[in-house]
């Protein structure tokens, strides 16, 4: 018999709140966390707004923030969300569990990015006569101005490694950075690890911020970001005819998942059961979905098949809903291909309309939102939905939360 996996702990750090209750209340109220970028001077960029987390201080969330002082923002967001999730699961204060069977699987963004130091090093190593970078001098500058710990913090594995060390989690430890799918994939792979008996418990989810000059300029070059000229809170408009790109957000979502009998034995509170997972690739283009939605269709259908539930049992779809022309059209097509006529009877919404796109952390935060929607019977809306798109013709819960049993 296949092992059943449940969620026993959850935590978030988002632009709409740094607790689950605060975040969800803001979502169902239709509030926006999007505003002018304050992290750096973005006035010369095509996009000047994002969904930032304001006044974040890790010391407010963990007992001892000193081990994190040299860590990047991705690790610090993850630590705060993980602290909440582990506390929610009753696993702090020397809880008696087998730590060798308790792992970490994240979809977390790149390690620390020391842009100011890097730019100054490039400037000092630039040879004006040859108009080129002196690589030997650049390496020498690195030896002067970097230390070993700072170098290690740039690696992709640092966030799960830090969480394992800080919370003494000695089981399997992985990070996958598969762009927007990262934390969803991490949760699915953590689920599979428990199913296969490699662990009994996993701390899983994601953490990411790309609200920095290279992140904004990079997505601007891809023409992926909204360049809306009005009120920034109106800029992200998933499934609307006039959508023009996504808005960067940042944050972390963390969950504790464990085998059902293990959770029952220790008297854990159970939030929900994870029943289905599937992972596919479009095999089309790195930056675009397949125009016929092949990967999306296969993934949705595969997850439903793996779960053993019927389409009629599904009461809500939390969409990726990025507010780009291609994604929203292809995602709608994928839902209709899998759900058939049922697609028009199943509410769909995108919380990216309010908190932007958390990139690697998006899936984890949106899963937690789904759990809260099921618990409360209230579905968050898709805000800024004004002009219907003939190709996006489902029920997107426009502009106002809805009471609905999901």
Language-model features: locations:
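Condensing-enzyme catalytic core mediating Claisen C-C bond formation in acyl metabolism
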Residues: 4-8, 31, 35, 230-307, ...
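Active-site-adjacent elements of ketosynthase-type condensing enzymes
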Residues: 42-55, 115, 209-236, 278-298, ...
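Phosphate/pyrophosphate-binding loops at sites that engage ATP/ADP/AMP, CoA/4′-phosphopantetheine
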Residues: 85-98, 263-267, 300-316, 338-342
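Short, well-ordered amphipathic alpha-helical segments that serve as non-catalytic structural scaffolds
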Residues: 78-89, 159, 258-259, 292-308, ...
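Glycine-/small-residue-rich "gating" segment that lines the acyl/pantetheine channel
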Residues: 127-147, 188, 192, 208-265, ...
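Active-site-proximal alpha-helical scaffold in enzymes
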Residues: 78-91, 156-167, 173-208, 247-268, ...
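A glycine- and small-aliphatic-rich helix-loop capping segment at beta-alpha/alpha-beta transitions
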Residues: 21-28, 113-131, 193-196, 216-229, ...
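Conserved beta-ketoacyl condensing-enzyme motif
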Residues: 7, 22, 31-174, 207-216, ...
